[in-house]
């Protein structure tokens, strides 16, 4: 998952800040920051979780 894709998923899921996402998925805000800056790749389980949440949200509406 690219930093742009992560940002897009965050917005679509209603996470307005890095801290919002970090709290929701149980990681540190600094980890989210590193992912968004592209310094560290988004771990595969996190990317999968965000994609699943987005799909579930789309199906609910």
Which functions belong to the PLM regions below?
Residues 17-18, 29:
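Helix-turn-helix DNA-binding elements, focusing on the entry/boundary residues of the two helices
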Residues 26-41:
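Recognition helix of helix-turn-helix/homeodomain-like DNA-binding domains
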Residues 44-61:
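DNA major-groove recognition helix of helix-turn-helix/homeodomain DNA-binding modules
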Residues 1-14, 48-51:
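A short, Lys/Arg-rich alpha-helix, primarily the initiator
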Residues 20-22:
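Short alpha-helical "recognition helix" segments of helix-turn-helix
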